[in-house]
Amino acid sequence: MAQEEPGGSNSVLNGDANSDKKMEKWTCALCPEGHDWSVIYFEPSSNIAAHENCLLYSSGLVECGPHDPRNPARSFAVKSVKKEIWRGRRLKCSFCNNKGATVGCDLQSCPKNYHLHCAKEDRAILQVDEDYGTYKLFCQRHAPGGQEPTQVDAAVKASFLKKCLEAGLLTELFEQIQQKMISIHGRFMDDTASESDYEGIKILLFDCGLFKDTLIKFEEAIKSKACECEERLNQMKQQLELLADLQQNLRSFQECGVLDPSGSTSGSLLPPEDHQCRCQESPEVQAGSGDSL
C-alpha cells in the first residue's frame, strides 16, 4: 500500500521535482570488491544514499523496472525510496530498538522488523532468487524448514575454536562473549531488552543444552529465594501484629485517662532532682564558670 508523503523541511523526504529520477549506482573506493556494503545508490539533488542490499531487502520497496539478470545495475525510483525511508521512521528494530527498520520477516504474520545489519546479527536467514530478482528475509523462528541459521557444519565450527586456541585467541573470544552477556544483562536490568535479547537467552538456556547444569543449580537459588521471601513475610506479619497491639494499648491508655491530651510536653526532659540542682547552683560557681571563659 502506498505511504503518505510527509511534510516538513527535510531535504531527504520533501519535494516531487525528482520523483521520476532513479538512484545512481556507485561503488565505494575503499571497500573490497564484491563486499556486501561496497555498492551504494545515490541521488545528489535529494541528498539520499543507501546500500544496495538495504534497498533490495526493504519490505516496502520494489524496483521500478523489470528485473534483468544480465544487468547488475538496479533500478530504484527516488520517490519510492523516499516513501520507504518515511515508512522506516515509524518502525522499530526488533534487535536494537532503534527506528528505521525497513527489513521485515517475510512471514506476514511475524511482527519482526530489522535494519539489515541487525538482521544478520540476529542470525536471520537471507534468501535470494537472482533469476526472478526476489530478496527475502526470515527471522530465526520462521526460517524455512531444514535451513539452519548458518550453513557452516559442526565440524568446521569445532575446528574454528581449536584454531583460536592454537593462535592464543580463545581467551579474547571468551572475553568478547562475556562482554556481550554483560551488555544483554544491562538491558534486562534497565528494561530496554529487545525481543531478540529474550529469544537469544531462551535459545542459549533451553535449546543448546550447554547450560543444563546451570539450570539445575538455579533451581536451588529459586528455593533459597522463596524461603528468604517467606521469612521476610513472617517478620512483617509479626511487626504488623506488634504495631496493632501498641495501637490498642494507646487507645486503652486514653480511655483510662492515663494520657492527658491537654498536658504539656514542652517542659524540661531532665529528672526533677537534676533540674532543681542546676537551678540552685551558687552565684560563686556561676561566676567561676564565667571567669573561666
Swiss-Prot record:
It comes from the Eukaryota. The keyword Coiled coil does not apply. A zinc finger (C2HC pre-PHD-type) spans 25-61. It is found in: Nucleus. The keyword Glycosyltransferase does not apply. GO terms for cellular component: nucleus. A zinc finger (PHD-type) spans 91-143. Keywords: Metal-binding, Nucleus, Zinc, Zinc-finger. GO terms for molecular function: zinc ion binding. Its main location: nucleus. Residues 263-293 are annotated as: Disordered. This is PHD finger protein 11-like.
